[in-house]
Structures are given as C-alpha cells and as structure tokens.
Amino acid sequence: MGIKKYKPTTNGRRNMTASDFSEITKTKPEKSLLDSQSHTAGRNSYGHITVRHRGGGHKQQYRLVDFKRIKDEVPATVKAIEYDPNRTANIALLVYADGVKSYILAPKGLEVGMQVQSGAEADIKVGNALPLTNIPVGTVIHNIELKPGKGGQLARSAGTSAQLLGKEGKYAIVRLSSGEVRLVLLTSRATIGTVGNEQHELINSGKAGRTRWQGKRPTVRGSVMNPNDHPHGGGEGKAPIGHPSPMSPWGKKTLGKKTRNKKARSNKLIVRGRRPGKH
C-alpha cells in the first residue's frame, strides 16, 4: 500500500501523509461480523483514570477478527481486503467452503481470490495457519499464540513478523521483531507471512486534530504543570525538576526503571531480551 502526500495548502496539510488505500477492495464492512463498542476514555468502573491520554475520537464499530483460526481442513476464499479502524493492519474477509464468513489479519501478499486454510495439514503459504510443530525452521510468521487455543497475541501490528529459529523439546524458539527471542509451545498456532500495510509507520498526522480523531488526547510535560499535579511542576519560569532522577506523576523514579515483574513466570521462556546485552 502506498503513501499519499498532500500539498501544503494549509498549515494542517503541510507534511501530512496518508495511506492511498490502494489495497482496499471493499469499503462497507460485513454486517454479521460487526459489534458495538463503548469508549471509556481511559476510566475504570469507578470513573478513575487508569490510562492517560485517551478520550474523544470518532465513533467506531468493532470488527470480529478471528485470531484463533481453528476451522481446520476447510478451505476459504479471500473475498475482500478491508480497512479496520481498530488496528493498524488491514483485514481480509474470508468465505469458507461451507458458507461461513470470517475476518483475519491481512498478511502481505494476500489478494482477493486466493485460498487459505488452517490445520496441521495446511500448506506453507501466506495466510495459512498451522501449529508451530508443523512449520519449517526459518519461516516468517505472525499472529502467534502464547497459549494454545487462546488466539494469536504476538506480531499482529502492521508490518510486523517473527521468525521461527528452531525447535527444542516441546518449545519453539521464536525471534520477535523487537529482537526478543523467546520460547513458545509447539502446539501453539501461527500464521505464515508478514502482517500487511507495512507503510503505516511512515504516516504523518500533520495536525493535532487528526490525532484527536483517533481518540488520543495531548501528552503534557510534567515540568509545565503545577507542583500539586506533578513532581516536576512548580518553580519560577523554566525551573529544573528538583529531583535527582525524573519522576512519574505518582512520585516514582522513572528513568530506566524496570516495570516488569522480576518474578514473572514467563521470564524463564525469554531466551534473550529485546534490549542488546540485557536478559
């Protein structure tokens, strides 16, 4: 998918880029695969902000995407490539041989009219989903399950992929796009290929309003807040933060502070961390 550049007719158009949607073949979504969703603006059931910088945005309908791919040995034909406002990747509309319709993440190279299949006996080609034990070493994969049957959780964003490096005992060794190498059960499923719409990272919003349409609110620096709002706040003019280390809004040291649980059970499944030289 290409990138469309705009002429600087206004300040908001200057440097603005957008997808040209050349891969999209159907503009209206499949009604049977839609669900409503409510926006909570980052609040929990008590009304407290649990995720900052969220709120507003355009109304959207959720597309029911199949991340499990458990309809085995039934071939499906790609009927359309569609836009999904809820994710960076495009989605593909499948129609199975028995008439059932489904959405999946659209991998790079998948086109209308192609056939895909899932199951242990499926061919090693783009869009097919198989258990890791049936995928050859060196294959590029995406939509990887962490728990068999739960559905894909890794490598789902636009342009991302992982590579199967090897198999050891009951585990597969997988290298993620972040550089992390981890073990995944061989009974977990993955889809062949790279997630499509890889040009997404080159898109420039151009103006703040376009970001607000996505439901993202401004991120304000702590140094320009009042001292009762942030540890960095207060002072006369541009004042230093007044602490030996940068702090979070809740008074915790934040620069380089590890937030992952040191006792997490999944630590033993990480062979190499995503940061060079760190485990």
UniProtKB/Swiss-Prot annotation:
The keyword Lyase does not apply. One of its GO terms (molecular function) is structural constituent of ribosome. Residues 1-43, 207-279 are annotated as: Disordered. GO terms for biological process: cytoplasmic translation. NCBIfam families: rplB_bact. The gene is rplB. One of the primary rRNA binding proteins. Required for association of the 30S and 50S subunits to form the 70S ribosome, for tRNA binding and peptide bond formation. It has been suggested to have peptidyltransferase activity; this is somewhat controversial. Makes several contacts with the 16S rRNA in the 70S ribosome. Residues 23-33 have a biased composition (Basic and acidic residues). Residues 209-219, 254-279 have a biased composition (Basic residues). This is Large ribosomal subunit protein uL2. Belongs to the universal ribosomal protein uL2 family. One of its GO terms (cellular component) is large ribosomal subunit. InterPro entries: NA-bd_OB-fold (IPR012340), Rib_uL2_dom2 (IPR014722), Ribosomal_uL2 (IPR002171), Ribosomal_uL2_bac/org-type (IPR005880), Ribosomal_uL2_C (IPR022669), Ribosomal_uL2_CS (IPR022671), Ribosomal_uL2_dom3 (IPR014726), Ribosomal_uL2_RNA-bd_dom (IPR022666). It comes from the Bacteria. Keywords: Ribonucleoprotein, Ribosomal protein, RNA-binding, rRNA-binding. Part of the 50S ribosomal subunit. Forms a bridge to the 30S subunit in the 70S ribosome. Residues 8-22, 34-43 have a biased composition (Polar residues). The keyword Heme does not apply. It comes from Lactiplantibacillus plantarum (strain ATCC BAA-793 / NCIMB 8826 / WCFS1) (Lactobacillus plantarum). Pfam families: Ribosomal_L2, Ribosomal_L2_C.
